[in-house]
């Protein structure tokens, strides 16, 4: 077996019961992106199946964050196709807003409000953006914090958590 084959490991679901299905959820086909004359994304082809966890690794300036930002249209592409669950990525409007509300990404720089507890940080968007009842938002937040293994930290301030724990809260 070659070194490359030995390095391939099975995907372990982040959430039990969310095993990869083989059904494409995110598809990038021949995606191209420029910043002026700088060709940042060159013929990117990627398929992420439902239930898979993807880690994008590469040197600084190689286009990792730019590629991720194109998936929810925080960056536009010059050419190619991006599909979410088989549907073309919306250009703008309500459908795009709905997609952004459903797709979570954490970039190198993420922010938690330093003056709010972990629970308050996680409930802020559902309460303010979706007008969710506070109790319902707290119940949902605790479920999400449990899923990423930081539910016991809910009453702490961000500065009391490790960098990895803070990133999981941001997710």
Regions found by a protein language model. Give the residues of each.
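N-terminal acidic, proline/glycine-rich, low-complexity intrinsically disordered segments
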Residues: 1-9
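ABC family nucleotide-binding domain
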Residues: 10-171
């Amino acid at each position: 077996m070659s070194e490359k084959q030995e390095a391939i490991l099975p995907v372990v679901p982040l959430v039990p019961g969310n095993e990869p299905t083989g059904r494409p959820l995110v598809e990038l086909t021949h995606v191209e992106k420029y910043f002026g004359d700088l060709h940042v994304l060159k013929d990117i082809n990627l398929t992420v199946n439902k239930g898979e966890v993807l880690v994008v690794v590469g040197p600084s300036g190689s286009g990792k964050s730019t590629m991720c930002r194109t998936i929810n249209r925080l960056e536009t592409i010059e050419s190619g196709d991006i599909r979410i669950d088989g549907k073309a990525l919306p250009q703008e409007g309500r459908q795009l807003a709905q997609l952004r509300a459903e797709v979570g990404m954490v970039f190198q720089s993420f922010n938690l409000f330093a003056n709010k507890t972990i629970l308050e940080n996680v409930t802020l968007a559902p309460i303010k953006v979706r007008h969710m009842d506070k109790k319902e938002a707290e119940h949902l937040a605790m479920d999400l914090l449990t899923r990423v293994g930081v539910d016991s930290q809910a009453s702490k301030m961000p500065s009391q958590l490790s960098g990895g724990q803070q990133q999981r809260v941001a997710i």
